[in-house]
């Protein structure tokens, strides 16, 4: 859960959490995104 990371202390501001989610929101929620990345790689 991004809301309660066990490896990181709960001292991070909400901005940091949003930054992580914006960096890879679908990748974290939907592993299917990885398949799409592989598809894009093949197209490249």
UniProtKB/Swiss-Prot annotation:
This is High molecular weight antigen. It comes from Babesia bovis. Residues 14-26 have a biased composition (Low complexity). Pfam families: Ribosomal_60s. Residues 27-38 have a biased composition (Acidic residues). Residues 1-44 are annotated as: Disordered. The lineage of its organism: Eukaryota, Sar, Alveolata, Apicomplexa, Aconoidasida.
């Amino acid at each position: 859960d991004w809301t309660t990371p066990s490896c990181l202390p709960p001292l991070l501001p909400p901005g940091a959490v949003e930054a992580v989610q914006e960096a890879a929101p679908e990748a974290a929620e939907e592993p299917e995104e990885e398949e799409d990345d592989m598809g894009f790689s093949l197209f490249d």
